[in-house]
Amino acid sequence: VYRTSDLWCPMEGVKEVSPRVYHAPQWKDARLKPGTVVALRTYYRPAPGIFLSNDKDTRLQNVKVHYAEGMGLLAQLCENITLDEFSVCLRGDKDPRYFTTQADATHFSSCRGKIDSRNGLYEGMMDDAINVHGTYLKIKQRLDDHTVIARYMHPQAYGFEWGVNGDEVQFVRSATMELTGGKNRVKEILPNDKDTVKGAKEYRITFAEPLDAEITDKEGFGKNRQGAEHLRP
């Protein structure tokens, strides 16, 4: 429905009473008026249209994604991405679909360098046109002046490499989002709850410089790997 949030349409008790006619006893939202087109979908996102990981200097040109069971383009841990005439769009006025992707048209996680999107069209997606973000780890334990145990906290953000030796990071106080201390560099990072990075939620991280005394697990500190320096929509 135009200019509204998602409508909740419970499927419990829905019965077909005649061909193409259904009784939905729990559809009681006042915005569901006769003539309203309802696009039913799940919130699962099993696969993006295009997936990039650990790539460098990638260029996607004259590409159209008309539908995907997730993001249109999902990129993680990449450096320098150019989208020229890259579109997430319907096939035209006669396209029978009402939406293109289950979530964002394009989504960039923990990328670095320059992200350039030009001459494209993003329409019909169920969330953002362009979403660019890093990924925080929360400090769970301070082992010494150089080493911490840190953990992915969001259920959709784990199982991929958070950082590598030499990466620059910044500490952030979670309650206020204020920067704390200066930047530091990763000397060593190892999965702590798994034998491999795949599936790991916790890391043991040793830093090159001593940590500020106030950085502990008591108040809730996170750290963000330094990501994309330039974004051009």
Residue locations for each model-derived region?
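Extracellular beta-strand-rich solenoid/capping regions of secreted or surface-exposed proteins
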Residues: Y44-K56, G70-C78, A105-S109, A228-P233
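All-beta strand scaffolds that present successive hydrophobic residues in beta-strands
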Residues: D57-V63, N80-F86, K114-R118, P233
